[in-house]
């Protein structure tokens, strides 16, 4: 029973020590600075590339074009000339 009672505090101690070592290593190598710069350039901040494949939708001129280009059908947004897939 003594072994079971010591396992949890020992595990927590090891996790705290290793996480602190990882933080120190990131500071020493400068990786922490790169991570901050990468977060500032993420799509969350409104930077949207028109050539990004995740933001692409098929172009169209009428609804029938979207019927064939979307898996479950869709309709054509005439203003943007893009398919709105369902």
From Swiss-Prot:
Keywords: Antimicrobial, Disulfide bond, Fungicide, Plant defense, Secreted, Signal. One of its GO terms (cellular component) is extracellular region. This is Defensin-like protein 259. Residues 1-25 form the signal peptide. It is found in: Secreted. Belongs to the DEFL family. Its main location: secreted. One of its GO terms (biological process) is killing of cells of another organism. Disulfide bonds join 60-76, 66-83, 70-85.
């Amino acid at each position: 029973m003594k072994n079971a009672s010591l396992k949890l505090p020992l595990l927590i101690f090891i996790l705290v020590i290793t996480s602190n070592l990882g933080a120190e290593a990131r500071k020493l190598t400068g990786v922490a600075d790169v991570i901050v710069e990468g977060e500032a350039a993420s799509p969350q901040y409104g930077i949207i590339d028109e050539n990004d494949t995740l933001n692409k939708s098929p172009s169209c001129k009428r609804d029938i074009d979207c019927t064939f280009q979307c898996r479950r059908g869709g309709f054509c947004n005439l203003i943007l000339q893009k398919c709105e897939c369902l």
